[in-house]
Structure formats: structure tokens, C-alpha cells
């Protein structure tokens, strides 16, 4: 509750945790399946296990953890967030997670999940990482080679390339003048999706874990490489820490799947000491 109410307040400035839990309990009462997308910020990032165990306690089997990274930049039209095009402008928002926090959060959470919860609780980034390890589609655009399939429509009918790119330069049109098919299958949108791969800096292209993250979301690529090349993901250090940490576990689960065995076998292997992890 403390994590939630620190930022999640209603329009009167009051905490909203109780209302959210009432909604969840109503869904459970009527047998409605649900999942959670939890934002990881500067506060809750330091408590990964408390955060994860809470979701397990309330019966949430499907969890997506989304790191929040935003830059503040005021515009004349009233906007206060910096777009990717403004990659050298803006100030990192106080609520943003650091790369180190993100890496530590994922590793700590994974260590509990891989020992106790494989096949019981489904954490999207772990599932997506295993999919990429297998050479399959990851099921989430941020970790895919290309993107462009997650357009968003605003209340007035304006359509943008992505819900992370609701900026004037990424507006595709309006539903009153163009169809969704026209906009989402346009050359402009196709180019937007391909730029996810084409705009990667050399450091990413030469990285041993490119296959696993594919540069993550372009929205976060406002940092520079050690050589000064633009386009490096702000969270790169955290993701690299995570992939390096989980590599031997992913190798084991991949082998299980390749041999038509459940990846959940890793829990028994770890328990029996059959799987030796060396970093």
C-alpha cells in the first residue's frame, strides 16, 4: 500500500490503494481473469521481493513490471515530457528508476522466481527473455527486433505510432479522416518500426546480448556509448546485469524446452544441486 499510494493518488490528491483492491476483489468474486502491470519507480525499485510477494499474496499469476523513465521538458503547447527527438534535452524526472536499480530489481526477483515459481507465476520479462533465448518472438514489442504494432488512439481520434510516442512528430493521423488499417500499415509506421533495429549504436550491435533485448524501447535511447555515439538505452547497464545473471538459467530452460521437457524442471535441479551456476 505504501508503494502504491506514494504516487497513485486520485484527482483529489487522496491515496487510491483501497479502491484498486476493491476493484480486484470484485473481479475475483465474479471469476474474471486479470493481470497486473506494475510501474517500477525510484521508490519501489529498492524493494523487489516485497513488491513481488505482494502480487503473489493477492493471487496475481501474470505480472508485467514496467520501469519508468521520463525526462521533463516544458513546451509552449503545455507538454512537459521530452520526446526521443529531443535526446539531448530535458531533465530526468525524479521518479525515474536508475539503471542500477533496474538491474538489481530484476536479478533479485528472478532469483526467487527461478527457485520457487517457474510455471506458477508468469513474469513477462522472464518469459520474453526465455523466448528470445529460444529464437522465438518475445511477445512484447520492447524486446523484439522491430516494433510498430502498438499504436495508440487519443480521445479525439488522433492516432500515434506508439503509446510511448504521443508527440506531434509521431502523429499518424485521425480516425475521422483515415482508417486504422491505413495508418498502422502506412510506410511511415513501417519505417518507425524498423528504426528500432536500424538506429542501434555500434555498442549494441556488437553486444553479446543483442538477441535478448534488441536495444529495448527506443523511447529510452537517449544516452551515449563510451565512444560518444548516441542512441544507447538509458537502462542498458541494468539490462546487461540482468542478462549476464540469468544466462546459465536460461540455457538450462532452453535445453529443457528443446527436449520437450518443462522449463519448470529447473526448480528441482536447483534444489537437488544438479545445476551448478558459475558467473
Where on the chain are the PLM-derived regions?
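Residue-identity detector for glutamine
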Residues: 1, 22, 61-64, 101, ...
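Radical SAM enzyme [4Fe-4S]-AdoMet core and its adjacent flexible, acidic
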Residues: 2, 6-18, 25, 29-142, ...
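A cytosolic small-molecule/anion-sensing beta-strand core signal
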Residues: 155
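Flexible mid-to-C-terminal extensions adjoining Fe-S/redox cofactors in radical SAM and related proteins
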Residues: 166-279
Amino acid at each position: 500500500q505504501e508503494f502504491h499510494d506514494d504516487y497513485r493518488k486520485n484527482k483529489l490528491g487522496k491515496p487510491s490503494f483501497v479502491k484498486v483492491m476493491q476493484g480486484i476483489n470484485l473481479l475475483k468474486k465474479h471469476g474474471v481473469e486479470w493481470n497486473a502491470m506494475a510501474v517500477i519507480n525510484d521508490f519501489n525499485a529498492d524493494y523487489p521481493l516485497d513488491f513481488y510477494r505482494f502480487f503473489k499474496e493477492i493471487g496475481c499469476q501474470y505480472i508485467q513490471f514496467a520501469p519508468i523513465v521520463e525526462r521533463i521538458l516544458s513546451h509552449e503547447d503545455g507538454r512537459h515530457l521530452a520526446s526521443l527527438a529531443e535526446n539531448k534535452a530535458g531533465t530526468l524526472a525524479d521518479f525515474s528508476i536508475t539503471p542500477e536499480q533496474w538491474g538489481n530489481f530484476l536479478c533479485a526477483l528472478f532469483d526467487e522466481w527461478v527457485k520457487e515459481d517457474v510455471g506458477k507465476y508468469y513474469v513477462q520479462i522472464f518469459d520474453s527473455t526465455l523466448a528470445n533465448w529460444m529464437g522465438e518472438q518475445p511477445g512484447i514489442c520492447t524486446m523484439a527486433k522491430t516494433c510498430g504494432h502498438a499504436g495508440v488512439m487519443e480521445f479525439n481520434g488522433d492516432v500515434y505510432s506508439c503509446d510511448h510516442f504521443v508527440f506531434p512528430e509521431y502523429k499518424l493521423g485521425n480516425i475521422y479522416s483515415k482508417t486504422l488499417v491505413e495508418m498502422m500499415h502506412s510506410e511511415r509506421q513501417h519505417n518507425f518500426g524498423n528504426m528500432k533495429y536500424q538506429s542501434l549504436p555500434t555498442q549494441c550491435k556488437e553486444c553479446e546480448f543483442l538477441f535478448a533485448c534488441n536495444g529495448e524501447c527506443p523511447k529510452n535511447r537517449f544516452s551515449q556509448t563510451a565512444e560518444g555515439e548516441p542512441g544507447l538505452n538509458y537502462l542498458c547497464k541494468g539490462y546487461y546485469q540482468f542478462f549476464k545473471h540469468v544466462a546459465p538459467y536460461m540455457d538450462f530452460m532452453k535445453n529443457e524446452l528443446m527436449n520437450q521437457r518443462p522449463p519448470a524442471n529447473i526448480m528441482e535441479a536447483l534444489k537437488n544441486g544438479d545445476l551448478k551456476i558459475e558467473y
